[in-house]
A protein has these predicted regions:
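Rieske [2Fe-2S] iron-sulfur-binding domain
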Residues: 12, 16, 24-26, 32, ...
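Basic polycationic patches enriched in arginine
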Residues: 7, 19-22
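C-terminal catalytic domain of Rieske-type non-heme iron oxygenases
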Residues: 86, 161-405
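Non-catalytic accessory segments flanking enzyme active sites
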Residues: 42-50, 213
Length: 405
């Protein structure tokens, strides 16, 4: 247990109550009252990484003919496309003398180590040692199963080293490779916290109002198997923003996690004169237990009102709007405490059920329990929060406010 800034944090197990500032009594409860105080419990973030498909980014960013380093799952990987057109992911350190393959060169179908030119194929086997008579039979390194789909590169992570089953395949995104939609407008950032923080947002309706300036009118969750879905409708906030441009009336969103780290959000923005149909990707992969790479991208459906150039401009504008939202989240994550025992009200949603669903990806397949994967459905009654928030919005308008409360 540690004490930080007036907050006791139980790291693991149980502990006696200790205070470095025992001499201070302002705002502090007595020892006899300590049993009535709610303490934050927080175990160390798991060092095991989630089983499932993880998106490393857009394929186009790996397609320049060079090897690329990716720090993921507590290690360093190298990504390269061989001369045969296959994209490969290997452990980045050569099994010969530890050279970094990401600093090497693609030669034919192999990646050549910059140290002694050992050539490694996409199957993990050393294909050639140019200066040697023979290639050692034990010259084999770790490989990662890959998937190229809808312009994105995925890798499969499994601590048990099993191959992915068809049931967990990432679904194809209608429009991602269609001329009727724009190309991906994509963002990447590093977040220095455990990736469970972003998962909690699936059930957190209230933060959309307080952090993102939305006004939710409908909110529902369904968890089943390896999927967790958030259904949300929101109204516009007339107390926010300027008067230039078309006024946004609200949004309709169906956002599903397909496994532990890849969310597809069918998101429609409703404006006064038209609707903009988009697909938003929200995905991440862990660097280590306490940091992850957050990526998000958007495509926009073209229409008579949104021809090619204007549609791409809209994708960029909406993408920048989404970027602002994620930056608001990151600012919270950067400063908040990890908490395993959140104190909740009904309107906070099924946080514990969501975390139980999420736990399935951190245990062996044989240890997955029915309550991790059985269908769970919860619809929030938005009557009370909507009334409270609408009252705030009206007060902001009356006061001439123009910022998020």
């Amino acid at each position: 247990m540690t004490y930080e800034g007036g907050r006791l944090i139980l790291i693991s197990g149980t502990s006696h109550l200790h205070r470095a500032d025992r001499g201070l009594n302002v705002g502090m409860e007595s020892q006899s009252d300590a049993g009535q105080v709610r303490f934050i419990e927080a175990q160390t973030a798991p060092t095991r990484f989630a089983r499932g498909w993880h998106c490393l980014g857009l394929i186009r960013d790996f397609d320049d003919g060079n090897p690329h380093a990716v720090n993921a799952f507590g290690q360093k990987l190298v990504v390269f496309r061989g001369g045969d057109g296959t994209i490969n992911v290997l452990d980045s350190y050569c099994r010969h003398m530890g050279g970094d393959l990401s600093n090497g060169e693609v030669k034919g179908d192999a990646i050549a180590c910059p140290f002694h030119d050992w050539r490694w194929g996409g199957d993990g086997r050393c294909k050639q040692v140019p200066y040697a008579k023979r290639t050692p039979r034990l010259a084999r390194t770790v490989t990662w199963t890959t998937l190229e789909q809808d312009g994105m590169l995925f890798v499969w992570n499994d601590p048990e080293h099993n191959q992915p089953v068809p049931e967990v395949t990432i679904p194809r995104i209608e429009g991602a490779t269609s001329d009727d939609w724009t190309d991906w407008h994509w963002y990447t950032t590093v977040v220095n916290t455990n990736c469970r923080e972003i998962i909690d947002n699936v059930v957190d309706m209230a933060h959309f109002y307080y952090i993102h300036g939305s006004l939710p009118t409908h909110f529902k969750n369904i968890f089943e198997g390896h999927m967790a879905t958030q259904y949300m409708n929101s109204a516009g906030r007339p107390d926010l923003g300027g008067t230039e441009g078309a006024r946004m009336l609200g949004t309709t969103s169906v956002a599903s996690y397909w496994g532990p780290s890849f969310m597809i959000d069918d998101l429609t923005y409703h404006y006064e004169h038209a609707d903009h149909h988009t697909v938003l990707i929200n995905c991440h992969y862990p660097i280590d237990a306490n940091s992850f790479v957050l990526q998000y991208g958007i495509i926009v459906k073209k229409s008579a009102d949104l021809p090619d150039d204007l549609a791409m401009e809209t994708a960029i504008a909406l993408g920048d709007f989404v970027k602002l939202g994620f930056e608001q989240d990151v600012a919270i994550w950067r400063n908040k405490a990890r908490i395993d025992n959140p104190l909740l009200v009904e309107e906070d949603g099924p946080v514990y059920q969501l975390r139980r669903w999420y736990q399935q990806f951190y245990v062996d397949v044989a240890d997955v329990q029915p309550d991790m994967v059985d269908r769970f459905e919860f619809e929030l009654d938005t009557t009370r929060p909507y009334a409270a928030w609408l009252k705030e919005v009206e007060a902001n308008i009356a006061a001439g406010a123009g910022s998020v409360p």
